[in-house]
């Protein structure tokens, strides 16, 4: 059963890709579904890239990254140090926008402090050309 949710998918930013895409998310069986054939998610076909998904009533977007040929990760883009937003990956590194020097790997694990804990993660699965993310809507 397909349904749509009142959320916006911002799959890229002007800074990194030159355009921004906003659209309703597709939800199947309570999971966010991203089709890698769609232009707004196509950058996730490349290891090291990421997209942000704006979720209605959430302060910071959901961040999804391509970790390897067979793995993806999904997590909150809210830095665990001071609550600033974590930026899209550059050269496989996620940096906190605060300028405090905190960085994370493509799976949301702390690489450099001041953050002491990993980003809040959500189960994500790559099946063929689709990514499924179990996100706790509510």
Language-model features: locations:
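N-terminal export leaders
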Residues: 1-7
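N-terminal pre-ligand scaffold of iron-sulfur
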Residues: 10-89, 121-138
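Short cysteine/histidine-rich zinc-coordinating motifs and their immediately flanking basic loops
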Residues: 24, 89-94, 107-112
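Short cysteine clusters
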Residues: 79, 96-97
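Low-complexity, intrinsically disordered Gly/Pro/Thr-rich segments
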Residues: 107-124
């Amino acid at each position: 059963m397909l349904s749509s949710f009142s959320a916006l998918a911002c799959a890229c930013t002007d800074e990194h890709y030159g355009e921004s895409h906003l659209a309703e998310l597709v939800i199947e069986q309570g999971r966010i579904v991203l089709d890698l054939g769609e232009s707004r998610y196509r950058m996730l076909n490349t290891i090291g890239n990421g997209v942000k998904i704006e979720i209605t009533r959430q302060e910071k977007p959901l961040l999804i990254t391509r970790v390897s040929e067979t793995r993806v990760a999904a997590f909150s883009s809210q830095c665990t140090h001071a609550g600033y937003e974590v930026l899209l990956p550059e050269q496989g590194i996620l940096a906190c926008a605060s300028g405090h020097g905190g960085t994370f790997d493509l799976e949301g694990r702390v690489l450099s402090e001041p953050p002491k804990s990993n980003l809040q993660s959500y189960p994500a699965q790559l099946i063929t050309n689709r990514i499924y993310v179990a996100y706790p809507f509510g």
